[in-house]
């Protein structure tokens, strides 16, 4: 056994070297040298000085003691290839290719010290470490029932494989992984019943930070990064690097181990791909666990839930997605599941609600699994229950595309007729949904509302304000197994379906648009063909809502005084919504052109023949009508030549339409009868 010890004023350096066929470290003799070049030696590093750093270099060291101990007798612990002990910090420089294989219940690189272990590759020679733990022990970290804590990796290539029930990097069986930091290098961590990085079986993964490097973390029956099977994953921060995390069955990609929550997860940068195992979220909760306090402020994040799990949020069977905030970055979140038992893109897993979700900025694409919301609640679970609701969802900015599939685009998950018949389930409601800004596309299908309730769910308390640009769409059922083509509301309730085959379209509700300024709501209902391979959906119905008009000016007509200063009566020239509600407008003459400007997307200009004659008399030859996205020029002479006592011109977004004299007369009667 070779020891690098710090037992006096300055810490010493132990530097094992390999020669042909296998030279021992100074002061030690090789034990059972093997034909494959591995030593039977072990290395123990002890630094008992808390204020000293012991520096060790591993250069082409290969140790294999994996045949020691008894995996069936937990009292017979095998040897650790390399063990770090003591109160002080130890820094290991990696040069060349190093391999450590430990016996049963011992970690490949076992750390029992309270100080910090740092693996680095600062020299010019590239270095790597492959560490494999015995059964119940981590690749790097704790042995059986041991914690793996205060571990830092700054460089090199590190491959860590945990033995059965242990983490790749972190805790052994029943041990937690805590205070693990990766700032650089390439790290591949794989577990079996533990987390890739984090806790072993029943152990938590806490205070894990990744600021750089390339990290691949795979949990087999544990989270990719976070808790081992049955362990919570919390206080996980990613600020940079390229991170790929995949959870095993029932475990989150980043977050909780099977049956546990994932909480306090923060991503501020880097590229992150997180995939949940079956029944678990990509980022957040595991099977039955919630995803709480998840914040994304930057980077590129792709999160995919397993069956029943949210992309970001809760796991299956009641896992909620709570207090989720996105402030920037590019986020793609996809809920898992097919034909029910599905999670939301962002929000709840199956039977789980999505609550207190806020998007302030960034580009967000959220797609729910079958009968789940894009943002909000999950579907009915595999064993029944109600679909999840979407509550207290706020969008203040950014670009948000949210698509539900039987659930709302934004709001509640859906309950199919079969769920009602079999389980007595209820659809998920969507309530207290506020959009204050940004560009939002919310699409519901299979009876889910664009914004509001999922299939058989209710929508209420929807507010759109500021400069928000909202497109809310609903698509009629295209399920060949369902005899009707019912639709949810664009904003409001999901459609109602009953086990006896009856269906009712979802009721539209009026969103509160009292605070809307320059934004709008575009409502679209699509009528698809039942053949999946046929032409694209056609629009069945479409309408717009715009900011409520401000109180009209005291004189909302046009006065010839503004032209030539000649006293004339006020001209009958008006701007209004397409429904006839007066809108404020400005007029200005430039030469022979009268410009009429209204700061609205859709508006109608109309006036009398008397107005046209008076304008022509005062030198106006053409009228230029200007709205947000469209400018149209009308000839005064041509309008007069058409005859009729009224004229009208409509702008609807980018489209203009001049009404004929007869249509204008009809409009006059409609508006003023």
What residue ranges belong to the model's regions?
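Long, contiguous ectodomains of secretory-pathway proteins
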Residues: 20-26, 32-46, 52-78, 85, ...
């Amino acid at each position: 056994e070779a020891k690098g010890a710090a037992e006096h004023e300055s810490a010493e350096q132990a530097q094992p070297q390999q020669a042909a066929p296998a030279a021992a470290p100074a002061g030690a003799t090789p034990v059972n040298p093997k034909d494959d070049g591995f030593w039977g030696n072990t290395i123990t590093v002890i630094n008992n000085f808390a204020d000293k750093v012991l520096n060790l270099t591993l250069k082409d060291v290969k140790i294999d003691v994996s045949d020691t101990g008894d995996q069936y007798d937990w009292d017979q612990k095998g040897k650790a290839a390399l063990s770090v002990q003591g109160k002080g910090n130890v820094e290991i420089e990696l040069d060349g290719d190093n391999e450590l294989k430990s016996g049963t219940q011992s970690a490949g690189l076992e750390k029992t010290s309270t100080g910090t272990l740092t693996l680095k590759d600062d020299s010019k020679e590239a270095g790597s470490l492959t560490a494999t733990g015995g059964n119940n022990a981590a690749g790097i970290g704790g042995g059986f029932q041991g914690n793996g804590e205060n571990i830092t990796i700054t460089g090199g290539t590190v491959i860590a494989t945990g033995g059965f029930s242990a983490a790749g990097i972190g805790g052994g069986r029943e041990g937690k992984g805590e205070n693990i930091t990766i700032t650089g290098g390439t790290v591949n961590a794989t577990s079996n019943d533990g987390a890739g990085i984090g806790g072993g079986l029943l152990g938590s993964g806490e205070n894990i930070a990744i600021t750089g490097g390339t990290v691949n973390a795979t949990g087999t029956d544990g989270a990719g990064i976070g808790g081992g099977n049955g362990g919570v994953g919390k206080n996980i921060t990613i600020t940079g690097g390229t991170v790929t995390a995949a959870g095993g069955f029932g475990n989150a990609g980043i977050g909780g181990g099977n049956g546990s929550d994932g909480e306090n997860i923060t991503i501020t940068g880097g590229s992150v791909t997180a995939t949940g195992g079956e029944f678990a979220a990509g980022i957040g909760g595991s099977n039955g666990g919630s995803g709480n306090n998840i914040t994304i402020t930057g980077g590129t994040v792709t999160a995919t839930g397993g069956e029943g799990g949210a992309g970001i949020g809760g796991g299956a069977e009641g896992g909620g997605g709570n207090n989720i905030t996105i402030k920037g970055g590019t986020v793609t979140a996809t809920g898992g599941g097919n034909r029910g038992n599905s999670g939301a893109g962002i929000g709840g897993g199956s039977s789980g609600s999505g609550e207190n979700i806020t998007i302030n900025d960034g580009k967000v694409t959220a797609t729910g699994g079958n009968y789940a919301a894009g943002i909000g609640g999950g579907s009915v679970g595999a064993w029944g229950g109600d679909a999840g609701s979407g509550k207290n969802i706020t969008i203040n900015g950014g670009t948000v595309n949210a698509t539900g599939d039987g659930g709302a685009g934004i709001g509640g998950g859906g309950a199919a007729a079969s769920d009602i018949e079999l389980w007595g389930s209820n659809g998920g409601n969507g309530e207290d949904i506020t959009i204050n800004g940004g560009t939002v596309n919310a699409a519901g299908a299979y009876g889910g509302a664009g914004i509001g309730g999922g299939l058989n769910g209710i929508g209420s308390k929807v507010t759109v304000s500021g400069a928000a640009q909202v497109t809310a769409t609903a698509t009629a059922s295209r399920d060949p197994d369902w005899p009707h083509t019912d639709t949810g509301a664009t904003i409001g309730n999901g459609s109602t379906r009953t086990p006896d085959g009856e269906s009712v379209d979802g009721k539209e509700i009026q969103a509160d648009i009292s605070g809307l300024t320059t934004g709008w709501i575009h409502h679209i209902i699509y009528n698809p063909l039942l053949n999946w391979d046929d032409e694209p959906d056609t629009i069945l119905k479409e309408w717009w809502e715009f900011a409520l008009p401000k109180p009209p000016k005291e004189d909302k007509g046009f006065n010839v005084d503004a032209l030539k200063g000649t006293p004339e009566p006020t001209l009958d020239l008006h701007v209004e919504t397409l429904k006839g509600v007066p809108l404020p407008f400005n007029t200005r003459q430039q030469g022979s052109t009268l410009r009429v400007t209204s700061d609205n997307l859709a508006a109608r200009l109309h006036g009398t023949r008397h107005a046209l004659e008076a304008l022509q008399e005062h030198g106006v030859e053409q009228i230029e009508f200007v709205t947000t996205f469209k400018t149209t020029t009308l000839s005064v002479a041509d309008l007069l030549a058409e005859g009729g006592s009224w004229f009208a011109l409509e702008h609807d977004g980018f489209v203009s339409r001049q009404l004929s004299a007869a249509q204008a007369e009809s409009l006059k009667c409609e508006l003023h009868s």
